[in-house]
Amino acid sequence: MNELDLNQYMDRVGRQARAASRAMARASTADKNRALLTIAAAIRRDADKLKAVNARDVERARANGQDAAFIDRLTLSDKAIATMAAGLGQIAALADPIGEISNMKFRPTGIQVGQMRVPLGVIGIIYESRPNVTIDAAALCLKSGNATILRGGSEAIESNTALAALVAEGLSAAGLPSEAVQVIETTDRAAVGRLITMTEYVDVIVPRGGKSLIARLMEEARVPMIKHLDGICHVYIDADADLDKAVRVCDNAKTQRYAPCNTMETLLVSQDIAAAALPPLCRIYQEKGVELRVCPATRATLEAAGFTGLVDAAEEDWRLEYLAPILAIKTVAGLDDAIAHINEYGSHHTDSIITENYSAGMRFIREVDSASVMINASTRFADGFEYGLGAEIGISNDKLHARGPVGLEGLTSLKYVVFGHGEIRT
């Protein structure tokens, strides 16, 4: 597709999305739920067809030398298809935030002022190899009354196109515009460049991908984004920590899964409890094959306890998101030092303190400048489902517009509404 054809194609997609967004904004909850449940039924009905289409994407990815982890993300297994269908039902069961009026108050002039929750409008979703994101993102945008333009990875183009056809079927069956969810059907990477600059059509971009994708979009996008670049998450073991809790939480925060953005990457330990806390915890880490990158004080503590195989932490280790069985460990003077380290080196994603000291815990959650802050809980809980949002479209570590896991409410905004009885301003 040449540049002229691409621009014309993207403009058409944008115009259709903008028109559809107006219809979606006034769609009833019943119609939106009907669409979601119809899509779920269509996915179950066409499961074998979806697997056949997906197999072609998988075969092509293997031929291109993609690794096993990539193939796993790309594959639509029976379980993945069932999960997609079930997820649609769960989103249909969520309360519809659109049209809610809150914060109503009477003014001395006689008017009544409040806020109404409304859709953002048109949301562009850019993601990589997971075809299930096509359904997850479409469902959240649909339920929140938005239109969406989906640009998945070229490796999943056939799977994404097939899923989009089922979404269009569900929208039409509910009397909603099929253009409310559109998948960009070209694999030309220039389509991403156009999508992120279409301020006349697109209200927000939500990228779901690796650091290189997010970094590129931060450089080039003109449309506002809901995103996070890194997940450099910390757990701090305070001097007043319960050791059993510390070991249990820190083990889970690092080793339950290594790849998610809410996995702990740096462990901070108060010098007053390091000799008691570090050996039992690091023994677990080494048994599980976790490489330990340590500061000098941590090395001294662990070597005194008989540990070997430690790696000296470099300055850059405090700023790294490993997404791997690697953990940076630093012994700190105390709470002040821990908070300062997190605010200096962290990515403002998720950080947790292990302590039995109420004042220390409250200081931590007040002063650590992150989207999620926790007391005596694993960073792995930083997730829309775990927070009771039902589902999430992503996690934001920005301060505007949404922060933390982004569910239905994160895909909406508030406008002021005023009720009067003929009042005039004097």
From Swiss-Prot:
Disulfide bonds: none annotated. One of its GO terms (biological process) is L-proline biosynthetic process. It is found in: Cytoplasm. It catalyses: L-glutamate 5-semialdehyde + phosphate + NADP(+) = L-glutamyl 5-phosphate + NADPH + H(+). Gene3D superfamilies: Aldehyde Dehydrogenase, Chain A, domain 1 (3.40.605.10), Aldehyde Dehydrogenase, Chain A, domain 2 (3.40.309.10). One of its GO terms (molecular function) is NADP binding. Pathway: Amino-acid biosynthesis; L-proline biosynthesis; L-glutamate 5-semialdehyde from L-glutamate: step 2/2. It comes from the Bacteria. The keyword Amino-acid biosynthesis applies. It is an enzyme of class 1 (oxidoreductase). PANTHER family: DELTA-1-PYRROLINE-5-CARBOXYLATE SYNTHASE, GLUTAMATE SEMIALDEHYDE DEHYDROGENASE. Catalyzes the NADPH-dependent reduction of L-glutamate 5-phosphate into L-glutamate 5-semialdehyde and phosphate. The product spontaneously undergoes cyclization to form 1-pyrroline-5-carboxylate. This is Gamma-glutamyl phosphate reductase. The gene is proA.
